[in-house]
Regions:
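Alpha-helical transmembrane segments of multi-pass membrane proteins predominantly involved
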Residues: 1-220
Length: 220
């Protein structure tokens, strides 16, 4: 029989693999699906972390998290992708091969740093902290190393996934209303980002963030 730690380890390894897929893939549609799969994995992680909780709190939180991260957010992003009429991240600031190498260094650094951190509560898995740190670094890297605004939104979601994993795996007794409130804030943020990407593409015929940074205000 697989223990709680065993289930958590499996989920966390899958999160690492999906993060590497994001670093090495140029297809925006595939990246959205990978981030959606990460959201589903976090739902399973929620259930594994709260297995001893007899209340309905864990299933409700897992269901809401999976619904938002695995269904609602991808739907909004696919809609923005269709409206923007782009399919690939063609010329990122950092190439995909180098991104994979940097990701490997992120993973090694996260494993080293996790062993140095004094944690007040035992984690559900020894992999939780290094995987969460690694995923956080991957999210930040996607934000700064990709040109397309849509890919940067995906980086933001990956960053939030890492923070969510930290909270679920380490913090005990957080009121569910607070956790659901954070998910609602994230939903609003992604909704606004999707609208912004659509309007940027409509006004400028592209969603390249580096080209937008060259704009200047011409006050009369």
């Amino acid at each position: 029989m697989i223990t709680v730690s065993g289930w958590a380890d499996t989920v966390l390894v899958c999160i690492v693999l999906t993060s590497f897929v994001l670093l090495g893939s140029s297809r925006l549609g595939a990246c959205i699906r990978v981030v959606a799969f990460q959201g589903v994995l976090l739902g399973f992680l929620t259930l594994a972390a709260r297995q001893d909780d007899p209340s309905l709190r864990a299933p409700i939180l897992a269901l809401v998290s999976t619904g938002l991260k695995g269904v609602a957010f991808p739907w909004l992003l696919f809609r923005a992708l269709r409206d923007a009429n782009v399919r690939r991240e063609v010329e990122p600031f950092v190439g995909y091969g180098l991104s994979m190498l940097i990701g490997t260094s992120f993973l090694a650094g996260s494993l080293w740093l996790a062993g140095k951190l004094p944690l007040p509560n035992p984690a559900i898995s020894t992999l939780l902290v290094p995987v969460a740190l690694f995923t956080m670094l991957v999210g930040l890297f996607l934000i700064v190393s990709r040109r397309k605004a849509l890919t940067q939104v995906l980086g933001y979601l990956v960053l939030e996934n890492a923070i969510y994993a930290f909270g679920v795996g380490l913090v005990e007794g957080t009121p569910m209303v607070v956790e659901l409130g954070v998910l609602l804030d994230l939903f609003v943020a992604v909704f606004v980002m999707g609208i912004a990407v659509f309007h940027i593409n409509r006004e400028f015929d592209h969603i390249d963030a580096d080209r937008l940074s060259a704009l200047r205000d011409w006050a009369g």
